[in-house]
């Protein structure tokens, strides 16, 4: 796009997000700063992104009829999936009919909506290094795959879930049924199918944020952010930092893998490519065709954060992935199961040097629900990590009184 309209006018440039959580909220803000009219869609009312968008819509996004009806009614220029649980076959149908452009493409949305599509693409089509894996449809198949192929320890995940839900490590035979039951409970759209992966004894894991954006000649160029290190607990990110130190050979392999998979997915936008690293060896893990939770650290480390990069790239604008400072992020959990909670300690948190926080505005809290994030920058990334965790620890969510 080279011309942008005025929001809420007949010539507005309209973008619809499918999924409006904390990541979508920041994308919406970035789009609005560029004069875009925004439509925030989610499965529940008052989702974080709906609180800041021009228009809020609530539907079951995995229902093809509801999704088609909404897109045909709103007629956005772009549809931007921000979650996996979407009727992607309908997106492909609408894209093929010329009704809408899907970011990055409808095919990419379909392939990345579950772990099977993207793993088969990476390992079987592109030949990228991955952990050994088997897909299973029953507890019996899971046990057989472990016994004959994968071995112990191993990792079990639902084919579709988010934020690590349903993911667990199996140390031995006694853990298999528990892991299966947990995966069935944690799948976002349960089809009774899991992936079991051989355990890689990696040194660390990173997210390689990769941006496909138009260059001055109108051709797609690939840009890389500095690698983001992160720690996950049960598959859910709890802290991240940027940059993560890497050997040059490992860095180049990481970027080659990221480019291979994002080139195949195509389109424009930011992708979060997760990788395991041991020495100079690198294995592909997963990819999301959208901003990544570990990439929230870029709100304090880059001149253009991951949300601004995504917004610019999908609109056909130039991008800048340069780092401005080392930094870190740490998750603020809900700590309680309640609606409309309040947060104490915000001022104390912000007294930690060089810190900031984001409270997402989710209408309902759970003990382990991500309700905010603390950010910290420092020339020394380890100082930034310590400060981010300290700031996060000072924010105290609680049930509102009265």
Swiss-Prot record:
Residue ranges constituting the ATP-grasp domain according to the UniProt record: 120-315
A Pfam family of this chain: PurT_C
Cellular-component GO terms for this entry: cytosol
Binding site for ATP: 115, 157, 162-167, 197-200, 205
Residues noted as binding N(1)-(5-phospho-beta-D-ribosyl)glycinamide in the record, renumbered to the chain: 22-23, 82, 293, 362, 369-370
Keyword field: ATP-binding, Ligase, Magnesium, Metal-binding, Nucleotide-binding, Purine biosynthesis
Entry EC no(s): 6.3.1.21
Pathway(s) of this molecule: Purine metabolism; IMP biosynthesis via de novo pathway; N(2)-formyl-N(1)-(5-phospho-D-ribosyl)glycinamide from N(1)-(5-phospho-D-ribosyl)glycinamide (formate route): step 1/1
Binding site for Mg(2+): 274, 286
InterPro entries: ATP-grasp, ATP-grasp_carboxylate-amine, ATP_grasp_subdomain_1, PreATP-grasp_dom_sf, PurT, PurT/PurK_preATP-grasp, PurT_C, Rudment_hybrid_motif
Domain of life: Bacteria
Reaction equation(s) it catalyzes: N(1)-(5-phospho-beta-D-ribosyl)glycinamide + formate + ATP = N(2)-formyl-N(1)-(5-phospho-beta-D-ribosyl)glycinamide + ADP + phosphate + H(+)
GO BP, one annotated term: 'de novo' IMP biosynthetic process
SUPFAM superfamilies, sorted: Glutathione synthetase ATP-binding domain-like, PreATP-grasp domain, Rudiment single hybrid motif
Function summary: Involved in the de novo purine biosynthesis. Catalyzes the transfer of formate to 5-phospho-ribosyl-glycinamide (GAR), producing 5-phospho-ribosyl-N-formylglycinamide (FGAR). Formate is provided by PurU via hydrolysis of 10-formyl-tetrahydrofolate.
HAMAP family: PurT (MF_01643)
Subunit structure: Homodimer.
Entry's family note: Belongs to the PurK/PurT family.
The protein's name: Formate-dependent phosphoribosylglycinamide formyltransferase
Lineage: Bacteria, Pseudomonadati, Pseudomonadota, Betaproteobacteria, Burkholderiales
């Amino acid at each position: 796009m080279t011309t942008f309209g005025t929001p809420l006018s007949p010539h507005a440039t309209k973008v619809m997000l499918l999924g409006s959580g904390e990541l979508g909220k920041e994308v919406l803000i970035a789009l609005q700063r560029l004069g875009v009219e925004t439509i925030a869609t989610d499965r529940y009312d008052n989702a974080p992104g709906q609180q800041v968008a021009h228009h809020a819509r609530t539907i079951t996004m995995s229902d093809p009829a509801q999704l088609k009806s909404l897109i045909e009614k709103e007629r956005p220029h772009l549809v931007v999936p921000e979650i996996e649980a979407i009727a992607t076959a309908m997106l492909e149908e609408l894209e093929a009919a010329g009704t809408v452009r899907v970011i990055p493409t409808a095919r990419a949305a379909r392939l990345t909506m579950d772990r099977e599509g993207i793993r088969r693409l990476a390992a079987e089509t592109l030949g990228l290094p991955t952990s050994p894996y088997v897909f299973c449809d029953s507890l019996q198949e899971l046990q057989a795959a472990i016994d004959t192929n994968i071995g112990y320890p191993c990792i079990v995940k639902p084919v579709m879930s988010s934020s690590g839900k349903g993911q667990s490590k199996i140390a031995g035979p006694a853990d298999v049924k528990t892991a299966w039951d947990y995966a069935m409970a944690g799948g976002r759209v349960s089809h009774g199918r899991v992936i079991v992966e051989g355990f890689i004894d990696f040194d660390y894991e990173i997210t390689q944020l990769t941006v496909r954006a138009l260059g001055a000649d109108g051709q797609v160029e690939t840009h890389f952010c500095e690698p983001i290190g992160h720690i996950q607990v049960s598959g859910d990110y709890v802290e991240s930092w940027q940059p993560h130190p890497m050997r040059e050979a490992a860095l180049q392999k990481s970027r080659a893998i990221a480019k291979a998979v994002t080139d195949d997915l195509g389109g424009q936008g930011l992708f979060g490519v997760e990788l395991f690293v041991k020495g100079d060896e690198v294995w592909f893990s997963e990819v999301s065709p959208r901003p990544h939770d570990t990439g929230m650290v870029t709100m304090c480390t880059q001149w253009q954060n991951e949300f601004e990069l995504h917004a610019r790239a999908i609109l056909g604008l130039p991008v800048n992935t340069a780092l401005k400072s080392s930094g870190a992020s740490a998750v603020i959990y809900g700590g309680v199961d309640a609606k409309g909670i309040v947060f104490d300690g915000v001022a104390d948190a912000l007294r930690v040097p060089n810190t900031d926080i984001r409270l997402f505005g989710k209408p309902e809290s759970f003990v382990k629900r991500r309700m905010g994030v603390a950010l910290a920058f420092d020339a020394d990334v380890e100082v930034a990590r310590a400060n981010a965790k300290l700031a996060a620890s000072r924010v105290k969510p609680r049930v509102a009184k009265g």
